[in-house]
Structures are given as C-alpha cells and as structure tokens.
Amino acid sequence: MGQFENTLAQMGITLPDAPAPAANYVPYVQVGDMLYVSGQISKGGDGLIVGKLGDDMDTAAGAEAAKVCAIALLAQVKAACGGDLDRLQRVVKLTGFVNSTADYTEQPQGINGASDFLGEALGEAGKHSRSAVSAAALPFGVAVEIEGIFQIK
C-alpha cells in the first residue's frame, strides 16, 4: 500500500473498485501524463445518493455526495495507474455538477465536499482548479456528478 492509500486508510476510507460506465463511454482517457476521468455520480456503498439541493437535500448532504464522487474519481485514477495510486502527481481540475433548484446558489459549498476530501487525502497534490455548476437534473436523479483531470506519472 502506497502513501496515498495509507492516508486514506487512516481516514477510514478504502477505495472501491472503479465503477463501470453507465452508458457508451470509457471511464477515463490518458493522453501523455494527463488523465481525463469521466463524470462519477454520487453512488456509495448504500446505493445512489439522490436528491435536489434547495428542495429535498441540504448543502451538507450535497457535500457528502460530492465526497463520494471524489472517492470514485480516485478509484478510477487507481485503475488507470495499474493499481498504484502513488502514480498520481496532482489533481488538476474538477468540474462538479449539482442537481439543484433554480434559486439554489450554494453549488460551490456542495462541491467543497470533494475538494476538502482531496486536499485532506492527497495534501498538496489534491489542490486543484474547479468549476461548480447547477444542473436541472442529473443521471438517475443523483445529487452530484463530478469529472476530473489528473496528472500522473
């Protein structure tokens, strides 16, 4: 177990197997040292995390859903790196989509659940640029979907 996975273990996190795509696309594409990971939905061990922020879900629950997405992103990175998460050099950028009402404005605070988790788990390598975008609906009614760009070695 490498450094990043040791840190995750200390946080009580074990990465799941990388989720299979839900439609006709690949989970990631590597170009040189850049890894582009498809959107990961808020699906944890207990199933889909569904809801609409500003309606039946609050920002704190949305942040937890975003953390679940970040865990799935790391699982995809690990798979792309042949099982060696320490090949990850840095998180470059996240794009977070938040299933939210038209008048909900706390998308950034919701996606902080992913950003805070990655910073804690990966340290300096977890700092990234980011967008947080409102969506009228997301696949399967999930609360959050996040895609990521990573640099690997």
Describe every region a protein language model picked out.
Residues M1-K153:
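Short, polar/acidic, helix-capping and beta-turn segments at strand->helix junctions
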